A protein has these predicted regions:
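Alpha-helical oligomerization segments with coiled-coil/rod-like character
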Residues: 1-60
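Residue-level recognition of beta-strand microenvironments
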Residues: 83, 123-124, 167-170
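Conserved, short, structured surface segments that act as functional micro-motifs
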Residues: 133-134, 154-199
């Protein structure tokens, strides 16, 4: 009986990893498109191919970068329950998982907020995970997934700490978790190094 439940659990972990890979592919595709758009916009301003950001996007990007370690959390209250990167599973040591961001446990119906000024680039749905919002901060992107409700629209300009939605509670296990990612171009960043006192 124990082996059967262990098998089911491992299958569930594999399914979660598959879903995480699909999310990563989707995010990369969106970021690729955003970078292409930014380059086109920058070329209209200057024919120099070395500039890839508009002046406004460059200012936002530079400010974002200079706030490493002091960005506000995407929730008023929360605890990091899964960190960035490769880690062994808590129960099955032989099972390794990779997290592209961090998972923050919080209270039911908590509001999610932007960690920095930016523009809503995408709002999309992830099967089994709810809605997700991708915000463009110049060269940087933040991803907020696991939302049941979204307050923003595509193209909206948003300020730091402005509410973007409400976190979803998984009715099967009663978990209320936000999955949060930071990307610099195509490179995944460890969000806990960017958020204020995350370590």
């Amino acid at each position: 009986k124990l082996q059967k439940s262990e098998k089911l659990f491992k299958t569930k972990i594999q399914q979660q990893q598959k879903e995480a890979l699909l999310l990563e592919k989707k995010i990369k595709k969106i970021i690729e498109e955003e970078i292409r758009k930014a380059r086109e916009a920058a070329k209209k301003i200057s024919e120099s191919s070395t500039i890839s950001l508009t002046p406004e996007a460059k200012i936002i990007s530079d400010k974002f970068s200079s706030n490493k370690g002091s960005l506000p959390w995407p929730l008023d209250q929360g605890l990091i329950v899964q960190f960035f990167g490769k880690q062994k599973h808590r129960v099955f040591n032989e099972v390794e998982t990779f997290n592209n961001g961090i998972n923050i446990a919080t209270n039911k119906n908590s509001n999610i907020r932007s960690v920095f000024d930016g523009k809503i680039s995408r709002i999309f749905f992830i099967k089994g995970e709810g809605k997700a919002v991708l915000i463009n901060h110049g060269e940087f992107f933040t991803v907020y997934s696991g939302l049941k409700e979204v307050f923003v629209k595509l193209g909206d300009k948003i300020l730091a700490k402005e509410k973007i939605g409400v976190v979803l509670t998984d009715e099967n296990n009663n978990k209320t978790e936000l999955h949060f990612e930071i990307w610099k171009g195509y490179d995944k960043q460890d969000p806990s190094l960017w958020l204020f006192e995350a370590y």
